[in-house]
Amino acid sequence: MRTTYDFAPLWRSTIGFDRLFDLVDAAQQAGTEDNYPPCNVERLSEDRYQISLAVAGFSADEIAITAEQSVLTVEGRKSEKQQREFLYQGISSRPFKRQFNLADYVQVKGASFDNGLLQIELVREIPEAMKPRRISISGSSASNVRQIDGKAA
């Protein structure tokens, strides 16, 4: 038996901790969330990522991928063309919906489907205005400094 807690009264009295409470809420829901189909999230390089989902038994036209704002959604629904009689069914064909929260400036570049494995390529593209840049320092250099010799009166 699982106990759920209502943090709403606590949230009303705090300002600036929205992200922290989102993480607590996400951790609480993680146990109740369906983790089908299994997936891997890989970092291919500094700014390239790949999500791989094991969707055996589905075809490419039975899967829909949508990216809306910062959420990537993968949905699958098996279309049964004919009734078959299984003696044992180990390959799942139930409908699914997986959502991935994307970080800022992460874009979906493409997807491929091969041998029951759906691979989604992601790239992080930070705008030029947001990238750090080096600022040169101008001013007098050491060669322009003159030393004045003299006695103070």
Swiss-Prot record:
Residues 30-140 form the sHSP domain. Keywords: Stress response. SUPFAM superfamilies: HSP20-like chaperones. One of its GO terms (cellular component) is cytoplasm. InterPro entries: A-crystallin/Hsp20_dom, ACD_IbpA/B, HSP20-like_chaperone. The keyword Cell membrane does not apply. Belongs to the small heat shock protein (HSP20) family. This is Small heat shock protein HspB. It comes from Bradyrhizobium diazoefficiens (strain JCM 10833 / BCRC 13528 / IAM 13628 / NBRC 14792 / USDA 110). The gene is hspB.
